[in-house]
Amino acid sequence: MAKLLSCVLGPRLYKIYRERDSERAPSSVPGTPTSVTNPHSSSWDTYYQPRALEKHADSILALASVFWSISYYSSPFAFFYLYRKGYLSLSKVVPFSHYAGTLLLLLAGVACLRGIGRWTNPQYRQFITILEATHRNHSAENKRQLANYNFDFRSWPVDFHWEEPSSRKESRGGPSRRGVALLRPEPLHRGTADTFLNRVKKLPCQITSYLVAHTLGRRMLYPGSVYLLQKALMPVLLQGQARLVEECHGRRAKLLACDGNEIDTMFVDRRGTAEPQGQKLVICCEGNAGFYEVGCVSTPLEAGYSVLGWNHPGFAGSTGVPFPQNEANAMDVVVQFAIHRLGFQPEDIILYAWSIGGFTATWAAMSYPDISAVILDASFDDLVPLALKVMPDSWRGLVTRTVRQHLNLNNAEQLCRYQGPVLLIRRTRDEIITTTVPEDIMSNRGNDLLLKFLQHRYPRVMAEEGLRVVRQWLEASSQLEEASIYSRWEVEEDWCLSVLRSYQAEHGPEFPWSVGEDMSADGRRQLALFLAQKHLNNFEATHCTPLPAQNFQMPWHL
């Protein structure tokens, strides 16, 4: 009877992974059926085959879940319509509650029928036995057996806790349950006394900003967190996850962040291969509709690196919602997992981000300064200009205030706090992070990210002459034009290197540098072009085109 209840309340099972061209060893978990432990299959993974009763009950519950999601998103409009029609009176609401209660009882009955269907299936009984054993005992053998199944990630046991590192428990400077530290935006009106009257005056605007951010804003910024989109992408995500496990021997893990969110991760270990880059770990930060199952992890994987992918809060198996604080909390536990559980030193970790993933990558670079390098692909400097681009001009004040208070993705500000090597990849036909049209390459916010970065590190070089010549170089629409500008100013790379190395030897590596202070205008132009060319690579593609492995290069450093 207990097993039947476990089948009723258990998670949905999607796939069962098998060893290729070999039989699985008999399970060591007591009570596991032996009739299904040795399936004859040449395929490494198979879809779980539910019985008819479970299959039909699952379809009904999935349909109910979709209808509930649609009702949730349309509830404000439905509430307004019902109010106008007078359907929210007590005489109308009571019968409706009876209908709703009856429907819930019917769905509960369907769930029980699904549980009976699972109970009659030896494959599901084997799975639920292993899952229960793993929850009772987190042994390596139980986890190894559980990894052979792909199921609803909410039931996956936690593999790593944010407080697990001993240094966190002893230190008072680490993250608290309120979250890790973020850079806070400066007040819009400096010098204004924050009196009680001023706070009352600001309250309506603050309430409006909060409502916009938590309803329309968050879903526009992170469409991957919308349940209906995830439901539509589920077959693709399952296929991508199977590829990572099957072909790359990936290991899935659940991490618990300091805010209580559970983060879904996938680790591919290449340290045992002959390729030297396998000793380096690339932590991948996906875009606003990207998942590690089908995202940018494929690029460093093809290049031979060890890779750790993770999903944003609210994406696929990760819980929560993707606000900046939750994003930083998730990134913190991912880095801690890489260091303290996977055994990589910060000097062997590379941060690779695509698009909006630049926020978490630059936060980690700022917070973990010993990290080896940062690669930002199709990223931007600040969210405000991009948000203003898609909203009505009359909303400018509301949009700016909402972004600064609730959705402040200040990539450039965070990147300038990092001292290590950085490479920016600019998509020359990017249609997402341009503020006008894709053909206007100067409206690409990747340009602003590069300029702010160089102006912080080399303020004397990026004075008026240097800034002007770098803008000319960024405006070039082809490699031929870039080379023409580079040769026009007769950039001597050996001279630039000698100047930078001599400054570093005399003053140390800490940025910002005052190099170029006593230099001629021509020398500053040469240095500015040299540094811009070393920190930015162009990729002739649109925003969502996968980056080829040959374009995944380590950043330049002295």
Swiss-Prot record:
GO terms for biological process: monoacylglycerol catabolic process; phosphatidylserine catabolic process. It holds the Pfam family ABHD16_N. It is found in: Membrane. SUPFAM superfamilies: alpha/beta-Hydrolases (SSF53474). Keywords: Hydrolase, Lipid metabolism, Membrane, Transmembrane, Transmembrane helix. Residues 114-558 are cytoplasmic. GO terms for molecular function: monoacylglycerol lipase activity; phospholipase activity. Residues 281-407 form the AB hydrolase-1 domain. Belongs to the AB hydrolase superfamily. ABHD16 family. This is Phosphatidylserine lipase ABHD16A. It comes from Bos taurus. The lineage of its organism: Eukaryota, Metazoa, Chordata, Craniata, Vertebrata.
